[in-house]
Swiss-Prot record:
NCBIfam families noted in UniProt: lexA
Subunit-level organization: Homodimer.
Biological process (GO), any one: proteolysis
PANTHER family for the chain: LEXA REPRESSOR (PTHR33516), LEXA REPRESSOR-RELATED (PTHR33516:SF2)
Native species: Alkaliphilus oremlandii (strain OhILAs) (Clostridium oremlandii (strain OhILAs))
Reaction catalysed by this enzyme: Hydrolysis of Ala-|-Gly bond in repressor LexA
Protein's name in the database: LexA repressor
E.C. code: 3.4.21.88
Positions of disulphide bridges: none
Alphabetical list of Pfam families matching this protein: LexA_DNA_bind (PF01726), Peptidase_S24 (PF00717)
Keyword Zinc-finger: no
Length: 206
C-alpha cells in the first residue's frame, strides 16, 4: 500500500488525515501548501487529482473543503482508525536531494498520530553500534522529525560525506561535536554539519 505515491503525495495525504482527525474537517489548499512547503496552489491541486485518481481521496467539486479520505487497504478502515498515519521509511539520504524523494522511500509504517505530533516525519534503519548506550541498537528503526537545527544534547540525524549518521549533537566554541553513545568510539568534530532531523522515537523487531 502507498507504493504508487511519491513523497509529496504521501505527505499531503498524511497531513489531511491529521487535520481531519484534529479539527473534524479537511484543510484548505492554501493550508496544504504551507504545511508541505509548496508555493503554488496549482501544484497542490495536481497532487490532489493524483490522490483521487489513485483512490485515496474523494472530492466534491462544488465544495472547496469537501475531501473524504478513502482506504484501498482491505484490512484497514480509516473511519475507524483515524489516529494512525503512514510514515515513510527512507532507504538512503543523499546531499542535495529531498529526503522524501520517491526513489528514497522503501516502504511506509503506521504510527499513532499523537506519537509523531506535528511536522514532517520519516523513519531510518540504523546500521552499527555507535548509539547503543542510548538504547539505539544495530538494525533498529528510528523515527525522525525533519528539522534543520538542533539543541545541545539532541539525538540527530546528520549528513556527513553523503551518508546519514545518528549521533548526539553538541555545538561548542569553534566546532560541532557529534558524539556517539558508545564509549569505545570517538566523537566526530566538524566546523559545520547538515542536520536532517531530530530522533523522536525508536522501535525494533524482537
Amino acid at each position: 500500500m502507498y507504493e504508487d505515491l511519491n513523497g509529496k503525495q504521501l505527505e499531503i495525504l498524511n497531513y489531511m488525515k491529521m487535520e481531519i482527525n484534529k479539527r473534524g474537517y479537511p484543510p484548505s489548499v492554501r493550508e496544504i501548501c504551507e504545511a508541505v512547503g509548496l508555493r503554488s496552489t496549482s501544484t497542490v491541486h495536481g497532487h490532489l487529482a493524483k490522490l483521487e485518481d489513485k483512490g485515496y481521496i474523494r472530492r466534491d467539486p462544488t465544495k472547496p473543503r469537501a475531501i473524504e479520505i478513502l482506504s484501498n487497504d482491505p484490512f484497514s478502515d480509516y473511519s475507524h482508525n483515524k489516529e494512525m498515519v503512514q510514515v515513510p521509511i527512507v532507504g538512503k539520504v543523499t546531499a542535495g536531494q529531498p529526503i522524501l524523494a520517491t526513489e528514497n522511500i522503501e516502504d511506509t509504517f503506521p504510527l499513532p498520530l499523537n506519537f509523531i505530533d506535528h511536522g514532517n516525519t520519516f523513519i531510518l534503519n540504523v546500521k552499527g553500534e555507535s548509539m547503543i548506550e542510548a538504547g539505539i541498537l544495530d538494525n533498529d528503526y528510528v523515527v525522525i522529525r525533519q528539522q534543520s537545527t538542533a539543541s545541545n544534547g539532541d539525538i540527530v540525524v546528520a549528513l556527513i560525506d553523503d551518508e546519514a549518521t545518528v549521533k548526539r549533537f553538541f555545538k561548542e566554541s569553534d566546532h560541532i561535536r557529534l558524539q556517539p553513545e558508545n564509549s569505545l568510539m570517538d566523537p566526530i568534530l566538524l566546523k559545520d554539519v547538515v542536520i536532517l532531523g531530530k530522533v523522536i522515537g525508536v522501535f525494533r523487531k524482537l
